[in-house]
Amino acid sequence: MKQQVEVKELKEGKYVIIDDEACVIKSITKSKPGKHGAAKARVEAIGLFDGQKRSYIGSVANKVYVPIVERKSAQVISITGDIAQLMDMGDFSTFEIVIPDELKDRVKEGEEVSYITALGKVKLDIRT
């Protein structure tokens, strides 16, 4: 799910969709309006699911999409290799997710973990 907002309403630390990917905004720089045009904005962001750096340059009056990012909790039902089966604690639905290498030693069966969902993608969100 996503909603539309103007570029001038974006803030650092919030989310934006760039190249059909949900991204976390790292910096925003705005130029002043000139004699013949509107103010421009440069948005630097990092992909929420792939970690790639992306940027958007456009007028501050342009509209961009902002993803609706949800943080939820789930219980780890089973682990098979690098795939964990999780059960959402809110609606009790089950789904599978790939465990990143850096989190393999921290995810255990029976424990509760938090995850992020946006634009139909899911990612574990275990804070250090």
From Swiss-Prot:
The keyword Cytoplasm applies. SUPFAM superfamilies: Nucleic acid-binding proteins, Translation proteins SH3-like domain. Keywords: Cytoplasm, Hypusine, Initiation factor, Protein biosynthesis. The keyword Cytoplasm applies. InterPro entries: IF5A-like, IF5A-like_N, NA-bd_OB-fold, Rib_uL2_dom2, Trans_elong_IF5A_hypusine_site, Transl_elong_IF5A_arc, Transl_elong_IF5A_C, Translation_prot_SH3-like_sf. GO terms for molecular function: ribosome binding; RNA binding; translation elongation factor activity; translation initiation factor activity. Functions by promoting the formation of the first peptide bond. This is Translation initiation factor 5A. It comes from Methanosarcina mazei (strain ATCC BAA-159 / DSM 3647 / Goe1 / Go1 / JCM 11833 / OCM 88). The gene is eif5a.
